[in-house]
Amino acid sequence: MARPKSSGSRMDRQLEHDVCELVRQVTGLQDEADPNFQLALDFVWSNFRFHRFLDVNSHKVEKTIEGIYEKFTIHSDLNKAASWKRLTKEFLNASLPSTEKIKTDAHYSILSLLLCLSDSPSNSNYVETPREKEVEKKDDFDWGKYLMEGEEIGLGPNIDTPNWSEDSDDEDAQQPLSREDSGIQVDRTPLEEQDHNRKGGPQVCWEDEPDSRSWLEQHVVHQYWTTRRFRIPHSAHLHSNLAAVWDQHLYSSDPLYVPDDRVVVTETQVIRETLWLLSGVKKMFIFQLIDGKVTVRNNIIVTHLTHSCLRSVLEQIAAYGQVVFRLQEFIDEVMGHSSESLPPGNGPIPKKQPDAPFRTYQAFMWALYKYFINFKEELTDIEKCVISSDTTITLAIVVNKLAPRLAQLKVLDKVFSTGVAEVPPDTRNVVRASHLLNTLYKAILEYDNVGEASEQTVSLLFSLWVETVRPYLQTVDEWIVHGHLWDGAREFIIQRNKNVPVNHRDFWYATYTLYSVSEKTENEDKVSDSASASSGSDQGPSSRQHTMVSFLKPVLKQIIMAGKSMQLLKNLNCAEGPACQAAARDAERKSLYTLFLESIQLRLQHGEDSAPHIVNEDQTTKENLIKMQSIAERHLELDDIHDPLLAINFARLYLEQSDFHEKFAGGDICVDRSSESVTCQTFELTLRSCLYPHIDKQYLHCCGNLMQTLKRDFRLVEYLQAMRNFFLMEGGDTMYDFYTSIFDKIREKETWQNVSFLNVQLQEAVGQRYPEDSLRLSISFENVDTTKKKLPVHILDGLTLSYKVPWPVDIVISVECQKIYNQVFLLLLQIKWAKYSLDVLLFGELGNAAERSQAKEDIPRDQDTPSQFGPPKESLRQQIHRMFLLRVKLMHFVNSLHNYIMTRILHSTGLEFQHQVEEAKDLDQLIKIHYRYLSTIHDRCLLREKVSFVKEAIMKVLNLALMFAEGWQAGLGAWQMESIEKMESDFKNCHMFLVTILNKAVCRGSFPHLESLALSLMAGMEQS
């Protein structure tokens, strides 16, 4: 546009100069003749002259000022807060150079500009600079005296009485009487009865309307709630006088009928009090609140309805009003507004709870509060329609409009009664919270199964549930993210046992308690979370239905594992690195509840966006449905079920799951609640897709970090390997040096049970190859039953190996685990003792003993004297040969057993165990893997009571081997032929028994790992 011509006004010239200077400063152009300068100048003038901007919002500025004041107060900047409050107040109450008024738009515009500039503050400490206010000099000069100097003023006799002119009276009479104040009531009757002498006085003149007085009379409500009767004008039509006609009929049919004294109200007044009742108003005329119950006044009638008809409708409305009062009372109680302040007779006075309501009740109250806000807005809109009278509004129309809301109130009352009101007052908070959430959850499932008919009800219940579950999800989020289970009101189903510290070895098992309450018996049980976590989704007896929060059952194990893992990580001081980095990451992180809401929104938007896509690709959907139906039919035919309807419903169910559809149909399908959709999204699927993945993700993150920390920083795998090296003797050379020193002492009949000797030998053996483990290993000896000690194989009973496992590795390698390790260790020691005793026997020793025995036979002796010792009838060489054969048989048996235990059991099972340890996702899974590994080797080493007879047979053979080695070492002179024959017979019987038992077990397939041992022992049997 063209540049405006400058006028002679000084302000216009100054404005033009300022605009040119603005263009120079912003664009950098200096020459006014430059075309670019002119374009910029025209643009600025265009914005100044033709653009319109909104006026400043004084309420918004006041709210911002108050918010800054509260912020200063919260941050303990009290000086700043006081200074800010005082300066802004002084500025708003001061006049500006351009105006004398206060709190003008100019004031608020300047403050708005300063507030906008404060969005990018500088980091500086504010110190208020005191300013001296300019005091206006009071003009003491008497201008009146100065100006009236020399003038004579005549004062009349009535100086104190002002002389009002008739013009002023006329002006007063012409003052308009505004009708903005709706409280003014003009009564015509007193005006008509006024004295006629005053008719000539000033009259009230009504402006704006020619008939303002009649307007005021029409818009002021008659006080129908008083005893004074008013005649309500209405039509003379028969339908408008139905009440009178009905009374006339009753009077004509019953001469003794006497009509009651009734108050006639209009239908509009009934509608208005109906809206007030549903809004929560307690003081009304038509509806009365007596002892907490809403009743209808009996003497109310309208002209066009019979008394019974009106009362029937109003009693139904009163029932819904009762629901509103009941829910509002709960809201007030939770918010802290006690009902004790109500006047007597307005309702029952419940006992005030000593403790504040817990967070789940507060969240439920907040959900109801938001619902009633929307409900009251709808009631306000209806009331505005009634006031405007643009359309016909009857009580039936209002009830019809409110029918969906009234149905929702009925559902809310049912949920509130079941979930809150019917719970005994002395019930624990954990039971109250769980019961309320379960009630909402079951109600959603119940109405969701109905389908489209209850879509609004499901939407209402789902919004209530989402709001009510917020504290639970916040508690879960705080626990699985920060490792802190904050639950001051003890409403969460998992409670922390503060008696067990984190660095205790029983932390993983005894720190948390899972509360489970039976609905039938209402008795509270405390179940260890380790048991519940290990059982997964296992349920208790069918006769007990627990009130555990239903929606958390599928992920309860993940929550417990993630929470304990994160707390353990926090205690290890290596969870998230430096605290500043963790705080920064936590500030950027979204809470579990926020992620849940976002997932729900995405799911709903996805369903809405995909509805046209489904309609457009209806043919593709039908083809996929037919394909799924054929698959379902084939699966049903395998079970001899021929049901086409069942098959097509299975097909629809499968199509709902995207992973199944991608696997079999190669695509994706989205469903909605319309009739064209394949099926409807159930509430469980919503939770499975919107809530559970976020919990699983945090579970994998926490437990993965804990496993990595234990393996990397606390050498968990190395400690497990050390247990196998020493207890299971995988460190062969080290343990060989240890136990051979003990075996040599036993063979030489020397004392070896000294604990100091045992520990010295152990330290010397371990310290050479595993110096870091030598300080952790120790051995002790305890005396056992003397009857067992008579047998050579039980001479080692009482040896106990101990390994000091540091925290937190002792959570995995517990004392109970070391007991199982020691049982296997003792068995291996007995087998190696028998094997060592047979291995150290030399053929030369027996040959030298035979030569010495033969030399003794050359000495003449009495042939008739029987020899107590020495070989009987058979020759000495034949006896030596039999002993050689028995030794080989015993060695074959012991070596077969030794190889089976060390290779097939310990080595193979150990490889599987190492692979499972690497794949363990959480500490609980690792503990189970370790226990399963110990249980496996315990069973396969035949240490279980069920197969004790097999172990006894093996122990008998080992005992024979040790007795044979002891006799071999003593020489032939200590043997009798009967002893050798008995030993051969016992060995043969035990051997045959074991082979038979093992073969039967292998043939049944119950113990496949025994197959190698059975084949090895069969190879050593004598062929008949």
Swiss-Prot record:
Region described as Disordered: 153-203, 523-545, 853-873
Biased composition (Basic and acidic residues): 189-198, 853-864
Composition bias, Low complexity: 529-543
Keyword Cell membrane recorded: no
Record-level GO cellular component terms: centrosome; ciliary basal body; cytosol; gamma-tubulin ring complex; microtubule; spindle pole
Gene expressing this chain: Tubgcp5
A molecular function (GO) term: gamma-tubulin binding
Chief location of this protein within or outside the cell: cytoplasm
One record GO biological process: microtubule nucleation
Keyword terms: Cytoplasm, Cytoskeleton, Microtubule
Subunit structure: Component of the gamma-tubulin ring complex (gTuRC) consisting of TUBGCP2, TUBGCP3, TUBGCP4, TUBGCP5 and TUBGCP6 and gamma-tubulin TUBG1 or TUBG2. TUBGCP2, TUBGCP3, TUBGCP4, TUBGCP5 and TUBGCP6 assemble in a 5:5:2:1:1 stoichiometry; each is associated with a gamma-tubulin, thereby arranging 14 gamma-tubulins in a helical manner. Gamma-tubulin at the first position is blocked by TUBGCP3 at the last position, allowing 13 protafilaments to grow into a microtubule.
PANTHER family documented for this protein: GAMMA TUBULIN COMPLEX PROTEIN, GAMMA-TUBULIN COMPLEX COMPONENT 5
UniProt-annotated location(s): Cytoplasm, Cytoskeleton, Microtubule organizing center, Centrosome
Keyword flag Electron transport: no
Family stated for the protein in its record: Belongs to the TUBGCP family.
Protein name: Gamma-tubulin complex component 5
Its biological purpose: Component of the gamma-tubulin ring complex (gTuRC) which mediates microtubule nucleation. The gTuRC regulates the minus-end nucleation of alpha-beta tubulin heterodimers that grow into microtubule protafilaments, a critical step in centrosome duplication and spindle formation.
Pfam family name, one: GCP_N_terminal
